[in-house]
Amino acid sequence: VHWTETERATIETVYQKLHLDEVGREALTRLFIVYPWTTRYFKSFGDLSSSKAIASNPKVTEHGLKVMNKLTEAIHNLDHIKDLFHKLSEKHFHELHVDPQNFKLLSKCLIIVLATKLGKQLTPDVQATWEKLLSVVVAALSREYH
């Protein structure tokens, strides 16, 4: 994947504005509420039976931060995303048996959360750049499935 200097700068500028724990929690909360079947992979999280339970669940916050920390690694290693996610792809395929469609759903939720945080700053160009970033991450996470 080729990244222009403008794309790299756009990713970094947006990233600097994010509170990772908050964005991660909100994206995962949105995933679980909008696509409730995705919770089946998170039985160890306890109560995910309602919007309120999901939003206040500390394990959702913890895992959301874990997701965002991995995304941080990707942002700081844009030219090596495929390698960076290799082991995680293996784990999600071989051990966790996660449907790779869920990665796409989470990326959609993340874009929506970015829109709520950035408002008018999420211009079409900014969105396109972040959609590109997340599609590269999703492809890397889904790689083991092919």
Curated annotation (Swiss-Prot):
Q: Would you tell me the protein name for this molecule? A: Hemoglobin subunit beta
> What task does this protein carry out?
Involved in oxygen transport from the lung to the various peripheral tissues.
- Residues annotated as binding heme b are H63, H92
**GO terms for MF:** haptoglobin binding; heme binding; metal ion binding; organic acid binding; oxygen binding; oxygen carrier activity; peroxidase activity
According to its UniProt record, in which tissues is this protein expressed? Red blood cells.
Q: Which InterPro entries match?
A: Globin, Globin-like_sf, Globin/Proto, Hemoglobin_b, Hemoglobin_oxygen_transport
Which gene is annotated as encoding this protein in its UniProt record?
HBB
Its domain of life reads Eukaryota
What is one term from the GO cellular component aspect held by the record? blood microparticle
Q: What pairs make up the disulfide bonds? A: none
Entries under CDD domains matching the protein: Hb-beta-like (cd08925)
